[in-house]
């Protein structure tokens, strides 16, 4: 039985055909249907020109007229209807801004990247598969349409798509396709970092990131980005083996970067180069920084807490301080990584004992934090100033507030206004602020 979204797609096909145009389902939906995978969206290719599509349907959006794409809206669903086209002249190893409309489905399929993405279905459900996409999928192979060198030279992004599809669908890259990919990897320098990031994000969020990372490493393609990435230092020895078990993108990226051994500043720099959002950069940075704080804290005066109770106390202290500095979310990220690979910390400078203590107590420690941000303190900067006669505002205020937060969070000082102010007075006097 067809779902509503699929029925809608066939309605669009039929309507186009009744007007004398050719129309087919194409691309990802055909591939995913053959594989009995859920279809995300139905794309349609037609001999009708964009203006004709606009005229024919009641609700349309002129999504990309210069590329021949009109979005047709039926009920709650959107269908991208694209005029048969070929991509005449590729410029600078990227897909061209201009396309040429054509009359033949076959030529339209020919410009597509991989055989499994170059199949079509007509309105009766007949498969049109001129390049043997179905057989390739059955043999577990990912293969370029036609000459792989030409395909990758036309559009270098296809090399990253190749690695993504191979990992996502568990396919081996066919030999000539792989050879061409390795030979042309240096063409990746023509691709904007943003597009590289989008492909990498999908690989990392995907079903088998380790496979994708393995292919990235063995092709050497990460060394060929337009702007250099520290991520390119990845090698087979430090693969984040349990990455597919992590649910969140932040945790996956943190785990990946930490596995390579990058410090927080290097991670931040790579993520900036890759044009990640400021918020995601901050979150991953904080998780990494919290991890390194824990590691450095443990390395300091190591001999003082070889005994379990002392080690536990020390860890609790560092964990809570880390939560104040970098936020609870940072530790949850580290905690989740540890939970999927308990021995992970061992190869990153933290003993197995410490790791297992963190794993058994870490959540409790976070819950036990009565306060974790200045906002929750029962005293603010203004009140502090009001109680400190003759003192003018200055950096000392922040210093005092941070001290109060730390003492309260660690359970050494109740979060009560008068006690907080008394402690503040002591602190100012003692430190000569
Ligand atoms: P998914 O959406 O799951 O990534 P998809 O196959 O639908 O898979 P899209 O990027 O949505 O991928 O593209 C739709 C179709 O357009 C592809 O199946 C392919 O036929 C064609 N296509 C997309 N990008 C390229 C490209 N860079 N070079 C050649 N053909 C492409
Ligand atoms: Mg798609």
What function would you assign to each model-found segment?
Residues 1-433:
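Catalytic cores of the polymerase beta-like nucleotidyltransferase superfamily
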